[in-house]
Amino acid sequence: MMAARMMAAGLAATALSAHAFRIPTPGEQDARIQTVPYHPEEVVLVRAWNGYVTRIVFDEQEKIIDVAAGFADGWQFSPEGNVLYIKAKSFPAQGSPAQAPEPGLWNTNLLVKTDRRLYDFDLVLASADAATPQALQRSRMAYRLQFRYPAAPQAASRASPVGPAVPAGALNRRYAMQVGNGSDGIAPIAAYDDGRHTWLTFRPGQPFPAVFAVAPDGTETLVNLHIDNQSLVIHRVAPVLMLRSGASVIRIVNQNGDASASPAFECHAEPAL
């Protein structure tokens, strides 16, 4: 098993050298506090250290809903709200003593899904001559990795709420909503798109659900979005969206291609959801 792991580590090292990834920027006060701009199509490098905990801090309005890694047996992942704690751990090799974390062999990929975004990481167990502050600085090991998000749309919306940059008459408001049993608490009060983005508007103080685009085969994919005042602005237009929060579920259907559809946002109960 460990021989196979060593072979996999060699392949992983080749992959790391063959593909580009985003290297976080060290902090001016301390290089172990690192920042990286968020981009949905970039892989971010995370350097950890045996015996130390690294935390990844996402947007304060995000909540982690899924974590997966290629070599999950060699790492401990502890999500708490919008923070993910990471620590290397011994590999429980069958029929032989447990293998302690070893730089190179423990390198893997890490995938994180929140209720707002998808994140991709190369997770590397760094090495140095000694576990001293100077060695940790040289290794660029991260105590904290935090993301910087583009244009802070929440702050901009507080100053002057923005909407679609098209005339109101050009908006598609032909959307229908199917509400599952007991799911009224996550129901939007309006839905529309401008051909590029979709807006779902909620009542003040209403919690935002996770939003998924539904493919023709029924597969659901978490969408990228940002918050504009009381609206979720989805960075795409989809035929069907699913809103989920715990057991609550709502189906939003884009009826723009249906000439018989009402031009106003409609809602009807659908207990089968």
UniProtKB/Swiss-Prot annotation:
InterPro entries: Conjugal_tfr_TrbG/VirB9/CagX, VirB9, VirB9/CagX/TrbG_C, VirB9/CagX/TrbG_C_sf. It is found in: Cell outer membrane. Pfam families: CagX. Keywords: Cell outer membrane, Membrane, Signal. Its main location: membrane. GO terms for cellular component: cell outer membrane. The keyword Signal applies. Residues 1-20 form the signal peptide. The keyword Membrane applies. B.parapertussis strain 10978 harboring a functional ptx-ptl promoter from B.pertussis produces the PtlF protein in a stable form. Is also able, but less efficiently, to produce and secrete the pertussis toxin (PTX). Belongs to the TrbG/VirB9 family. This is Type IV secretion system protein PtlF homolog. It comes from Bordetella parapertussis (strain 12822 / ATCC BAA-587 / NCTC 13253). The gene is ptlF.
